[in-house]
């Protein structure tokens, strides 16, 4: 019965209008890949590597490391300008922007680098969905609607992204010819997920089912 309920997934009303847009799956996939490429990029940057090795930054506080966490939600937003005549910045106002911020902050609690909302997961391609891991089903503050949250298991430890660096021209070329196959062929995506084994996923699914029940 539980499996049947899980299979009959409730579609988030927020994504219904987005799902009708042509090419939305590829668009959403590429947005997530953009985050993953940023994650790989900061671990491939020579200046950041030099900062990590600078004893002045780590003196008295232990090892110093530059890292990033990401949160993503899908929906509408209003763009506007804030600031003064001396400095103007763009800002985005929307409950979806707030949700993305909450996803990012919650990633610390779940011990992951990247967290995606159900709204994003429902828009991604079938191939991309096989790479996501369902972390939990939660009710976000200010809302009574339950929402599934997901992660893409990205880890930099034990990965030398410098060995798989590419020119800017090659990166642009690969981005323009996107296909869902990239999830199984891109060196960056494969390397940051190399710590995920079939055994881990099987054990996790058993534990996750018990947790959800």
Model feature map: region roles:
Residues 1-30, 41-95, 119-129, 143-148:
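Catalytic core of nucleotidyl cyclases, primarily class III adenylyl/guanylyl cyclases
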Residues 34, 38:
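Acidic, glycine-rich loop-and-strand cores that form catalytic or ligand-binding grooves
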Residues 40, 62, 67, 76-79, ...:
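Intrinsically disordered, glycine/charged-rich C-terminal tails and inter-domain linkers
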